[in-house]
Amino acid sequence: MGIQGGSVLFGLLLILAVFCHSGHSLQCYSCPNPTADCKTAVNCSSGFDACLITKAGLRVYNQCWKFEHCTFNEVTTRLKESELTYHCCKKDLCNINEQLENGGTSLSEKTVLLLVTPFLAAAWSLHP
C-alpha cells in the first residue's frame, strides 16, 4: 500500500469517524420535583448536552439541559424562578448539590468576566 492507498484508508477512517458515534449520551441527575437530595440518574435525550443544577430558595432542580440555554435569563424563564443560583456542566453526573455549595460559579459570571476584560484592557491602553 503506497501513498495513495494510505490516503484512501485515511479518507475511509475520516468518513467513519464523522458518520459514526459512540452512542453515549450524557448522564445527569434528574428529579421531576425540586428536591435537595436528587439521586436519580438518567440518560439525557438527544440535544441535551449539559446537566443543570439550580437552587431557588429551598428548591433544588436537577435536570438535563441544553448548554446553549445555560444563561441566567433562560434558566429563570424556563424554571419560572426570579432569584436563583445555577451551575451547568458537561460531564456525567456532574450536577450535584456540592457544585452550588462549594462556590461553583455560574456561566453568567464567567461570561461577564470575559466581556469586561477586553474593555478594561482597552481602557488601560488609552490611559496616558
Swiss-Prot record:
TM region positions: none
Post-translational modification: N- and O-glycosylated.
Official protein name in the record: CD59 glycoprotein
Lipid anchor positions (GPI-anchor amidated asparagine): N102
The organism of origin for this protein: Pongo abelii
Propeptide regions on this chain: 103-128
GO molecular function annotation: complement binding
Annotated GO CC locations: external side of plasma membrane
SMART domains: LU (SM00134)
SUPFAM superfamilies (UniProt xref): Snake toxin-like (SSF57302)
Domain of life: Eukaryota
Signal peptide location: 1-25
Glycosylation sites noted in the Swiss-Prot or TrEMBL record: N43
